[in-house]
């Protein structure tokens, strides 16, 4: 039995005991989480190229946190707190392949909601499935991502999942780079939430004397440029 209970519209909400457990835990603070990311050297400045081909003056490497079970769980717990506070309703958790799979696994475990896995492409052997796991057609999926730029990876994943007769209405990420994802995803009827924003990261780097206010505004202006 999972932590999902049926509602009138066919979606599901997290069971009360799980909600209470999440709410009772000490909230993950943005500053504490930033400090852990900083210590793990997740922030790099310079010239880096994203999947989109766009150059960025700052790169956030959240893949590094999979090497720290404690920090990885902090990230998942922070997402779960956001999920519960936002009263999101869903039947399954899916990590955007493949960097978000560790996060999705922990979110599934903390909330006691089934996880599915979406392959980048269907297997050419065996069952040839694109979606791995046990699910009912018409169920609702929550997408989990680590870092979001324009939201394109989420859009691609949502489209593929919808083509498998599943619904996708919400997506959540650890970090929003604030490069248009919220508006882009809204065009596909996707509600987007995040725990951290790029501006919060830049503010944290200022407190570490790694950046000036002037440089922060230069980076924000650069990130605001259209792709």
UniProtKB/Swiss-Prot annotation:
Residues reported in the UniProt entry to bind 5-phospho-alpha-D-ribose 1-diphosphate: 51, 119-120, 123
SUPFAM superfamilies: PRTase-like
EC number(s) on file: 2.4.2.10, 2.4.2.9
Tissue: Expressed in body wall muscles, spermatheca and vulva muscles.
Leader sequence residues: none
A family per Pfam: Pribosyltran
Xref: PROSITE patterns: PUR_PYR_PR_TRANSFER (PS00103)
GO biological process, one term: UMP salvage
Highest taxon of the lineage: Eukaryota
Coiled-coil regions listed in the entry: none
Top class in the EC scheme: transferase
Keyword annotations of the record: Glycosyltransferase, Pyrimidine biosynthesis, Transferase
Known pathway: Pyrimidine metabolism; UMP biosynthesis via de novo pathway; UMP from orotate: step 1/2; Pyrimidine metabolism; UMP biosynthesis via salvage pathway; UMP from uracil: step 1/1
InterPro entries: OPRT, Or_phspho_trans_dom, PRibTrfase_dom, PRTase-like
GO terms for MF: orotate phosphoribosyltransferase activity; orotidine-5'-phosphate decarboxylase activity; uracil phosphoribosyltransferase activity
Reaction equation(s) it catalyzes: orotidine 5'-phosphate + diphosphate = orotate + 5-phospho-alpha-D-ribose 1-diphosphate; UMP + diphosphate = 5-phospho-alpha-D-ribose 1-diphosphate + uracil
Subunit composition and interactions: Homodimer.
Annotated HAMAP family: PyrE
Protein's job: Phosphoribosyltransferase which catalyzes the formation of UMP from uracil in vitro and thus may be involved in UMP biosynthesis via the salvage pathway. May also participate in the first step of UMP synthesis by catalyzing the formation of orotidine 5'-phosphate, a UMP precursor, from orotate.
Family the UniProt entry places it in: Belongs to the purine/pyrimidine phosphoribosyltransferase family. PyrE subfamily.
The name this protein goes by in its record: Orotate phosphoribosyltransferase
Source organism of this protein record: Caenorhabditis elegans
